[in-house]
Amino acid sequence: MTKEKELHCSFCGKEQKEVDKLIAGTSGYICNECIELCHDMLANADDIEEIDEEFQEEEPKLPTPHEIRAHLDDYVIGQDYAKKVLAVAVYNHYKRLRSEKNTSEVELGKSNILLIGPTGSGKTLLAQTLARMLNVPFAMADATTLTEAGYVGEDVENVLQKLLQNCDYDIEKAQQGIIYIDEIDKITRKSENPSITRDVSGEGVQQALLKLVEGTVASIPPQGGRKHPQQEMLRVDTSKILFICGGAFAGLDKIIEKRTNTSGKGIGFGADVRIDEEKVSLTELFKQVEPDDLMKFGLIPEFIGRLPVIAPLSELDEEALVKILTEPKNALTKQYQVLFSLENIELEFTQEALIAMAKKALARKTGARGLRSIVETLLLDTMYDLPSIENLQKVIVEEETVTENKVPVLKFNS
């Protein structure tokens, strides 16, 4: 047998006589048929990559301001002006992110948002609803727990850590996210004049937040670890993250009144003031807020400059609280009705009971936030006994249940 007859393709095993060509390599042979097959496979792979790239380029349609506002209406009662401001700001923010993929000589700046409104007016809910609608990661932090790096308390960069955790440490997703910082009015500096002493929980936190809010590349330890020199860090670009800050800003109304020479009666949110001989709500007054007013309140100028969009929220009245109990898609009464239906029991709230609950929340000055506590207290004993009561068909919460702590009316199957 000659050496030529022993030669064969190292891939398909065919002998030299069975193929047109056999090409020698350093440690084997490949036939023309295997070369053609490999060429076809690589060509198909290129086609698949092109299809993948085209598919990735097709982003979901960005909802318009009208669509954003309509979605907020499904979950948040009232606050029409704030919804409009938020809808436009959020639309422009994500439009800016998409425009960065296209070459443009004009660089679009980021517009973070400041929500001003009393406790329980819906600031947090608005931010959460926006993130859920846009399907982007969301993280929330309480400004009062934050301190400068190196001091006892929560480092401001921990906020980014929360955002990363909420998207399984996908940096690209995190950089499209929304961060809500509550109680921002509680980190004001103690006086208008700079102090020689270090204010690590007031002005110091504002300074620490400044870089994150305006945009920086932050180094975050992976999977919630602590920073150390040898560790490989995750780098997050915060210039693409939308920051929404919220606070009650109690007393800001007086600063605006003083500047505008306004005289009014009543104090706090919801009071009426007189401007140009006309009575308007404090919400209208807060629409006139200027950077100087916020500086006098205690925010530093640099921080104010990073929150150019201001959305005032009004205090919720009795009618709004009743609507909050019943109208949103995830209204409180609907949630408890679902809980009771899991036991095959119907739950009903009379209109008088709803009004009484709204009045109780107003008296507590807790806004919508206090409604869950009220409903939970009213139904505690009933929910405790529920699984043990036989033949129960319906539970009715009446006005007396709220005002006189009476047990809800129970109706049984006959």
UniProtKB/Swiss-Prot annotation:
This is ATP-dependent Clp protease ATP-binding subunit ClpX. One of its GO terms (molecular function) is unfolded protein binding. ATP-dependent specificity component of the Clp protease. It directs the protease to specific substrates. Can perform chaperone functions in the absence of ClpP. Keywords: ATP-binding, Chaperone, Metal-binding, Nucleotide-binding, Zinc. ATP binds at P118, T119, G120, S121, G122, K123, T124, L125. The keyword Transferase does not apply. SUPFAM superfamilies: Glucocorticoid receptor-like (DNA-binding domain), P-loop containing nucleoside triphosphate hydrolases. Belongs to the ClpX chaperone family. The gene is clpX.
